[in-house]
Amino acid sequence: MVLRRLLRKRWVLGVVFGLSLIYFLSSTLKQEERTIRDRTLLEARDSDHHIQWKVKFILGNSSRQISQCRNSIQGKSLLTDELGYVCERKDLLVNGCCNVNAPSSSQYVCKSCLSNGCCSIYEYCVSCCLQPDKQPLLERFLNRAAEGFQNLFTAVEDHFELCLAKCRTSSQSVQHENTYRNPQAKYCYGESPPELLPI
């Protein structure tokens, strides 16, 4: 009863409104400061951010046991290592590299890829994208990428990471919601998306 009477008084409502307004304004200004700081960090990183195009790797006596390799990890049966070798999961060495002596291992495989750079198998897309002659294509893509897309690729450090990111299914591969433009070629590293198929 007393609380109801107190809340009906104009000065109490004014104080509650004033405190709410102060809280709202301070929260908004803090959020704006964070946004400005984040933009500044991205711009600073963009200006000096360069992709490392050649993977530094010492083959030594070709046993390849000395160094570690990163690989595409996610494949159920196939994997691609950072040197562009595609191999079956069973032919992966402990250091993460494909065993180049295994019959299933091949470098720079474009088996399931079309001329527009779209492939039906993710690992072949990454391997094909890692070919040294694909560097100009990827540089053109990075230079023409929309601002929001460039922010996504600022975390990419080298050619391998760029190919991993580029070959993942993107919105360019999708025709409508969960329908692919071309279900047989949904992993793309190229500039042009797959052709639209009739629904």
Swiss-Prot record:
Q: Which residues form a coiled coil?
A: none
Q: Please give the InterPro entries that the UniProt record associates with this protein.
A: SPRING1 (IPR019352)
Q: Which residues are glycosylated?
A: 61
Q: Which cysteine pairs are joined by S-S bonds? A: none
Q: Which residues cross the membrane?
A: 12-29
Q: Which residues lie on this side of the membrane: Cytoplasmic?
A: 1-11
Task: Report the protein name in the record.
Answer: SREBP regulating gene protein
Identify the coding gene: spring
